[in-house]
């Protein structure tokens, strides 16, 4: 039953109070574990992402060490079921392209077409995950347009499929974007203690870190959380919605 393999879980957490969010990222990923049991990972600014195969809990003996080694007040994380690409550590997420880390929940069906737009890359579409191709295209669009919002408004027209992304930039900002059709769920929450913002696939991850649900991320919305607090913009004005009914039955 192919659809079961199309759900991953993403999370992005930022503490304006300079609290180490890594233990929270791990708790959130454990709460999202039912969305992907193949691999998991997390990323902080200016460091290669940490990626592991299997369940989050299988690494519980290393949690303390990971929290110390990757200590950061901003991070993103991912639990994976493979959609396109091989089930190995290389295709596990978050992925890092230049100075942007990317975690993706969804499926992009025109990978080959999209990869033709990505010039001078070192992979062939056969071994590239859909996320890698989208991330490389996005980074080249950011280089041309200077802004993530403008890049997403172009990418959404080039890409066929569904997406919820969390991004992390090396200048220490967490971003979240939900596709214009709202096919995949995305919610945001806040925790007073440490002034922590969280964006994630499901409210279970918000409860897991002791935060409160604030609202759904609107389809076509890009959220940025940084030292300047939370900013939001729309990268799409498409009003057609197409929620995945499978999400409601399987993950609710």
Predicted regions mapped to residue ranges:
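Conserved short alpha-helical segments that host acidic/polar catalytic motifs at enzyme active sites
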Residues: 1-252
């Amino acid at each position: 039953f192919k659809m079961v393999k199309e759900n991953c879980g993403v999370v992005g957490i930022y503490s304006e109070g300079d609290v180490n969010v890594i233990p929270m990222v791990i708790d959130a990923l454990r709460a999202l574990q039912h969305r992907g049991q193949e691999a998991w990972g997390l990323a902080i600014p200016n460091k290669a992402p940490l990626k592991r195969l299997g369940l989050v809990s299988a690494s519980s003996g290393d949690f303390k060490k990971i929290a110390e080694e990757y200590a950061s007040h901003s991070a993103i994380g991912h639990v994976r079921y493979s959609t396109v690409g091989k089930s190995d550590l290389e295709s596990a997420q978050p992925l890092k392209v230049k100075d942007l880390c990317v975690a993706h929940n969804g499926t992009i069906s025109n990978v080959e077409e999209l990869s033709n737009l990505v010039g001078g890359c070192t992979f062939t579409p056969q071994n590239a995950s859909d996320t890698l191709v989208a991330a490389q295209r996005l980074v080249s669009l950011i280089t041309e347009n200077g802004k993530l919002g403008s890049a997403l408004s172009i990418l959404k027209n080039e890409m066929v499929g569904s997406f919820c992304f969390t991004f992390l930039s090396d200048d220490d900002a967490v971003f979240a974007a939900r596709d214009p059709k709202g096919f995949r769920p995305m919610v945001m929450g806040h925790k007073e203690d440490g002034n922590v913002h969280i964006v994630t696939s499901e409210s279970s991850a918000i409860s897991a870190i002791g935060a409160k649900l604030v609202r759904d991320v609107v389809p076509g919305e890009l959220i940025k959380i940084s030292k300047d607090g939370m900013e939001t913009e729309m990268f799409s004005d498409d009003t057609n919605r197409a929620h995945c009914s499978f999400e409601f039955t399987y993950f609710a």
